[in-house]
A protein has these predicted regions:
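Non-catalytic terminal segments and appended small domains
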Residues: 3-183
């Protein structure tokens, strides 16, 4: 049918520019112990074994859903920093933009603390293995508490291509983790 032909053409024109990976068990353990000392090493190991790589829900989805490595609850005004256990390898002229899942943003005003998370292509090679962290806040002005069970999608990442200026002369090389390029 004509619909199948259009879908097939669209699939052929989609750019395959990235791949998700898990960080090492040691990196996940370190991140979890720093932020969540209440969890035992055995509990963190179990969380790591249950991590899911981000994936699109449908063929038409632009966003790759990121899944909560552990259950969390956010009352209005509360913030949490989540080590996802995920890293993203992508072509040089692409960026991964991170947003809350639409439903959580709409129902609870769940927001990224930096509005949009930006994962640069060279972050993959940083000292922390390019471990993607997400800091989110329940900005509800209706008194709504959000509960996210472990393994549930809570954020989404969208790959976007970008350009540079004709006279760009950036030569720096990333070696640190989050926020290291501003030091």
């Amino acid at each position: 049918s004509a619909g199948n032909v259009r879908r097939k053409r669209k699939e052929q024109t989609m750019h395959r520019i990235a791949k998700f990976h898990f960080v090492s068990p040691g990196q996940f353990l370190t991140a979890m112990q720093e932020g969540y000392p209440q969890y035992t090493e055995a509990q963190i190991k179990e969380m790591y074994e249950n991590l899911k790589l981000p994936r699109r829900a449908t063929k038409g989805s632009a966003g790759y859903d990121f899944f909560a490595p552990f259950a969390f609850t956010l009352a209005p005004g509360e913030t949490i920093k989540i080590p996802t256990g995920i890293r993203a390898e992508m072509k040089e002229d692409w960026v991964l933009q991170i947003y809350p899942r639409s439903g959580l943003g709409f129902k609870y005003r769940l927001q990224m603390n930096n509005t949009v998370g930006i994962i640069d292509s060279d972050y993959f090679f940083s000292d922390n293995e390019g471990h993607i962290f997400m800091k989110i806040t329940n900005d509800s002005n209706e008194g709504k508490t959000v509960e996210v069970p472990a393994g549930t999608g809570f954020a989404q990442g969208i790959f976007m291509q970008y350009g540079i200026t004709e006279d760009d002369d950036a030569e720096g090389i990333r070696n640190g983790g989050f926020g290291s390029t501003t030091k």
